[in-house]
Structures are given as structure tokens and as C-alpha cells.
Regions:
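Acidic/His metal-coordination segments adjacent to aromatic residues that form catalytic metal sites
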Residues: 68-72, 97-98
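Membrane-helix boundary connector in multi-pass membrane proteins
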Residues: 94-104
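N-terminal intrinsically disordered, cationic/polar leader segments
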Residues: 1-38, 45-46, 51-57, 64, ...
Length: 143
């Protein structure tokens, strides 16, 4: 699996990403996108439009990485996740353009991401050791 392309300034986080197993990378990406969306909401309330937009752009990049990490041969779950990520990207894009309902849209996306993160964490904790490539493919991750 390719490493996330999100810029990382923090040395600890950079090391964590470089040494993470594929399942851990997914969790790191979920944590990052949730953080970016929460920061966007705070900055929206503070009327810092530029910071709001930057955090939404970062969140979109992470969600696109999550899409790219899917093994589309693992049907139907990979296709369903792809569609869900696509929906999230549209909602974030709408929030960037339509100020009226952006708070509700972003909160809905955050809840979905939190649910997905919880699910992936459960999978990580119950999945067999990640040495076998076939095991990873079954978990919808591409190498």
C-alpha cells in the first residue's frame, strides 16, 4: 500500500506513518480526515474562511487516498466504500460552496468517518497477522 501523500510536518507522526502496517495506515488516515473536518468547523464558526477551506481541501485529499487504497477486486464491499467516499467528497465540496448547510453536512460526514474508523479498528483487532498478502486483499486493501 502506498503511503499517504498528505504533508506531514510532525516527526513523530511521520515516523508512525512510515512504520505503520496497512491497517494502521487506514486508521491514521481516518484520524487525520476527522481532525481536518473538525478544524474546518471551528474555523467556520470563527469566520476564518481561508483556514476553513484549507482544512476541507486536506480532508478531501485524505478521502481520495482512502479511495485509492481500496482493492476493487474485493466486491461488493470495496465498491460500497468507494461510493461512500465519493458521497463524502461531494458533501465536502458542497460545504465549500454552499455556506447555509455546511455545518450539518460536515457533521454528517464526520459521524460516518467515525463509524468507519471504529469498524476498521475492530477489523484490525480481529484480523489475522498481516503477513499474508491474500489476507490483506480480503480486507479490501491493496498492497
Amino acid at each position: 500500500m502506498e503511503r499517504p501523500k498528505v504533508p506531514v510536518d510532525d516527526r513523530y507522526l511521520r515516523m508512525k506513518i512510515q512504520t505503520a502496517k496497512p491497517m494502521e495506515l487506514i486508521l491514521i488516515m481516518y484520524d487525520g480526515v476527522i481532525l481536518f473536518l473538525k478544524r474546518a468547523l471551528v474555523n467556520y464558526e470563527l469566520r476564518k474562511r481561508h483556514v476553513f477551506d484549507e482544512n476541507l481541501k486536506k480532508s478531501k485529499r485524505v478521502i481520495k487516498e482512502l479511495q485509492l487504497s481500496l482493492n476493487m477486486d474485493a466486491k461488493p464491499i470495496a465498491g460500497q466504500l468507494y461510493s461512500l467516499y465519493d458521497y463524502m467528497l461531494r458533501e465536502i465540496g458542497d460545504a465549500m460552496c454552499n455556506r447555509k448547510e455546511n455545518r450539518a453536512k460536515l457533521q454528517r460526514v464526520i459521524r460516518m468517518l467515525q463509524d468507519l474508523r471504529t469498524t476498521w479498528d475492530k477489523i484490525k483487532n480481529t484480523a489475522p497477522v498481516e503477513k499474508d498478502k491474500r489476507t490483506l486483499e480480503k480486507l479490501t486493501l491493496s498492497m
